[in-house]
Design a protein with these regions (language model features):
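Long, contiguous amphipathic alpha-helices that act as assembly "spine/axial" helices in icosahedral shell
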Residues: 1-64, 111-125, 210-223
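Sequence/fold signature of self-assembling virion shell proteins
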Residues: 62-106, 118-122, 126-251
Length: 251
């Protein structure tokens, strides 16, 4: 990504902020958005690794169908809203491989000299809305306490919504929405080694001046690839993600 500023002396006179500093920050923000979108695109790729033990369509495993589009039609707007029960089912799919070969390990997070193991759930804004409004267990603050060590960056910020049965729950409005019988979303329960990011060239920042520094261009550049990890067993299966589809009807 790149951005160019022209006639900086005049542009600076028309603003109350530093044009170059704000432009550089905006470029970095857009670069981060691109990275996030690429991670989500990789994790939500169903072309490989799709087995019943890594997918949950709504509240019950019985909604599974070998054809992905058909399975989506089994999700309804009443019984298949995201819930703590669905989070529990997804976690058990990860830990106890039924219709899959291997378990999914939780990710290990370093906390100073110690470490903790957690699964994480990225949930769409509409899915979280349904769980907050409809699931009494989630609303029970005695059960939905912030984990020990709440000063960690893992448990802060507006995206972090709480923890349930060893699963850290985060809001992610960029998860895909899919039109089916109703609108549904793909929430992601993630363990260790769900995806890989590989760089051929690490991120570099470049600056170029022209017209005696009246014009300035900034560029962020990298060579990288992001892919969901799929283990090649007798049947290929996703290595570290359970796909949790739920209702996501718009307001």
């Amino acid at each position: 990504r790149a951005v160019k500023f022209e006639d900086i002396p005049m542009s600076q006179k028309r603003t109350m902020f530093n044009v170059l500093s704000e432009g550089k920050a905006a470029l970095e923000d857009e670069f981060a958005v691109d990275f996030d979108d690429d991670v989500i695109s990789a994790l939500t790729d169903h072309a490989s690794g799709r087995v019943r033990g890594r997918y949950l369509y709504g509240a019950t495993d019985a909604n599974w169908n070998a054809t992905h589009a058909t399975a989506l039609t089994n999700i309804d707007g009443t019984n298949d809203m995201l819930s703590t029960a669905m989070i529990g089912v997804a976690k058990r799919k990860a830990l106890i491989p039924v219709n899959a070969t291997a378990k999914i390990r939780p990710a290990r997070f370093k906390m100073g000299k110690d470490s903790e193991q957690w699964f994480t759930l990225w949930a769409h804004t509409f899915a979280l809305r349904d769980m907050v409004n409809s699931d009494a267990a989630w609303r029970n603050r005695e059960l939905n306490l912030t984990p020990t060590g709440s000063n960690s960056v893992l448990f802060n910020g507006s995206a972090f919504k709480g923890a349930w049965e060893g699963v850290l729950v985060y809001e992610n409005e960029r998860l895909p929405l899919v039109a089916s019988t109703i609108q549904v979303t793909e929430n992601l329960l993630l363990g260790a080694q769900a995806a890989a990011v590989v760089w051929g060239q690490r991120t570099k920042f470049n600056e170029e001046e022209a017209d005696f520094a009246h014009d300035v261009s900034y560029e962020l550049h990298e060579i990288r690839g992001i892919e969901k990890l799929v283990f090649s067993r007798a049947t290929e299966e996703d290595n570290g993600v359970v796909h949790v589809f739920s209702a996501a009807v718009a307001d």
